Amino acid sequence: MTDNTDNDKLYRYLFQDRAVRGEWVRLNQTFTDTLNTHQYPKVIQNLLGEMMVATSLLTATLKFEGDITVQVQGDGPLKLALVNGNHQQQIRALARLQADVSDDMSLAQLVGKGVLVITIAPTEGERYQGVIALDKPTITACLEDYFVRSEQLQTQLIIRAGEFEGQPVAAGMLLQIMPDGSGSPEDFEHLATLAATVKEEELFGLTAEELLYRLYHEERVEIFPSQPISFFCGCSQERSGAALLLISDEELDEVLAEHNGTIDMQCECCGTHYFFNKAAIMQLKVEK
């Protein structure tokens, strides 16, 4: 049986004798909550799981308050897959399909001609956006390439998503040479070689301490306190109402007439419904 102690947590760790840092994350209930309101095919579920883990690992590298959005855009059956996470490890995800998919489809078959877009948005300061070609077989490989190109740091990403003991789970590890230039490529390669031996069931079933001991029992590893991860959408009646105000009065009247006087707005991420009748819309306009 899995030890649930480290479910939905992120750990950072350092190697005391080598200038290399690491992160480990596992999503259990967070992943389940994301999938609960959608009937995504298994291949899309797993892709979102990989992207959620990657987003969690990416946000943990931020040195400021803000959020990161990781999205896949393409002209294939998968039109969009999007994950957003912030420095508090609150995360949400959604996918949009424009054709049927099968679970044996590769990333290239799902996306067609597509790109991976990473947007970093500090609470204060300028946004940064990077666009990466989806020219590798997995999202993980594309993101690993992004790290190397954007930060010019040796980086290893190991991410898995699927089921363990009958429940959805996604987990992963990030290994990165320290940005201060004190680390050696040889040290990084040594640790990366050890990390590459990790098994899926170990990522899904062991605690962080057990896993790191299994991989690095001859190393001195300092593990920092964990950070909890949770599904958080952020939608609200107010935000939905603000979106309605962007529509012309004529269009609103048409939609109201077509839907028996009530507009039902459903959040794509969490599935919550927000209802607006004519009186509610008029009140929104007054408050504006």
From Swiss-Prot:
GO MF, one example: unfolded protein binding
Origin superkingdom: Bacteria
CC terms in the record's Gene Ontology section: cytoplasm
Subcellular location: Cytoplasm
CDD domains, A to Z: Hsp33
Post-translational modification: Under oxidizing conditions two disulfide bonds are formed involving the reactive cysteines. Under reducing conditions zinc is bound to the reactive cysteines and the protein is inactive.
Pfam families with a match to the protein in the record: HSP33 (PF01430)
Keywords annotated in UniProt: Chaperone, Cytoplasm, Disulfide bond, Redox-active center, Zinc
UniProt keyword Ion transport, yes or no: no
Family listed: Belongs to the HSP33 family.
Bridged cysteine pairs (disulfide): C233-C235, C267-C270
PANTHER family: 33 KDA CHAPERONIN
Protein name: 33 kDa chaperonin
Any one biological process term the GO annotation gives: protein refolding
Cited InterPro entries: Heat_shock_Hsp33 (IPR000397), Heat_shock_Hsp33_C (IPR016154), Heat_shock_Hsp33_N (IPR016153), Hsp33_helix_hairpin_bin_dom_sf (IPR023212)
Function: Redox regulated molecular chaperone. Protects both thermally unfolding and oxidatively damaged proteins from irreversible aggregation. Plays an important role in the bacterial defense system toward oxidative stress.
Source species: Pasteurella multocida (strain Pm70)
